[in-house]
């Protein structure tokens, strides 16, 4: 039996960029809120100060090199960089991955995952003073021309020698596979374009999904090659279903007895 291939999700956000400056204030990064965390009870360790690399800045190549080395030592095969394409050529935080691609460094395997979802103000502000949500970047699906433009945007990555493949097909994960207006049409266009550009076997499409088996089936039926479960505890509960049913039965009996 072959070993599972461990690939770590890589969020390219931990650095200042102009959109975050405009939305949250000059110099804002995800570290801003990490550093502001306060203990809520005795013994609560907050804020959690990051070890090893500290409050790192992903704009620094040395940080990316050190991350790759740490991942390699931990048995991780590669990184799946989150990729943001909002339609009509609108992207966010592409600079980090573009530097990795163009520089050839770190020399560590990678693939891409499309985070096809809108950004809203509630991401970092869910306080009672701000109940009304505000869209900051809206995920759009303009049509075939945009599907083609999107493919051309990631084609250089697919052709990189570091790109992770399954059966000689580059992996491409989609965060919300059911959010695509016509997933099979998208997959068909990309596979056609891949073959026209020398990727003879096409793309290995992976759909991110919660742990419900019904959703898994739907994603595979619309043309995806594989599933990446996001709630492994649900899958585990299904494996242990017999035990969970037995515990549930006992709890119901206790509940009925206490009501008598």
Set out the residue ranges of the language-model regions:
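Glycan-processing catalytic domains of CAZymes
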Residues: 1-260
């Amino acid at each position: 039996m072959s070993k599972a291939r461990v690939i770590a999700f890589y969020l390219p956000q931990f650095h200042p960029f102009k959109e975050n400056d405009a939305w949250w204030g000059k110099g804002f990064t995800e570290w801003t809120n990490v550093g502001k965390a306060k203990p809520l009870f005795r013994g609560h360790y907050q804020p959690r100060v990051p070890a090893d690399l500290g409050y790192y800045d992903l704009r620094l190549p040395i940080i990316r090199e050190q991350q790759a080395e740490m991942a390699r030592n931990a048995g991780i095969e590669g990184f799946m960089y989150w990729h943001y394409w909002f339609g009509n050529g609108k992207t966010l935080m592409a600079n980090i991955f573009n530097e990795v691609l163009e520089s050839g460094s770190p020399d560590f395997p990678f693939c891409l995952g499309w985070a096809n979802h809108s950004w809203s103000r509630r991401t970092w502000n869910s306080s009672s003073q701000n109940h009304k949500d505000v869209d900051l970047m809206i995920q759009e699906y303009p049509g075939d021309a945009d599907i083609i433009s999107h493919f051309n945007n990631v084609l250089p990555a697919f052709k990189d020698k570091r790109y992770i493949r399954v059966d000689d097909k580059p992996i491409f994960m989609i965060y919300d596979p059911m959010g695509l207006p016509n997933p099979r049409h998208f997959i068909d266009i990309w596979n056609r374009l891949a073959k026209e550009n020398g990727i003879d076997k096409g793309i290995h499409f992976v759909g991110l999904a919660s742990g419900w088996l019904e959703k898994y089936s739907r994603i595979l039926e619309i043309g995806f090659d594989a599933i990446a479960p996001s709630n492994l505890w649900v899958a585990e509960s299904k494996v242990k279903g017999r035990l969970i049913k037995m515990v549930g039965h006992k709890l119901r009996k206790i509940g009925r007895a206490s009501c008598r």
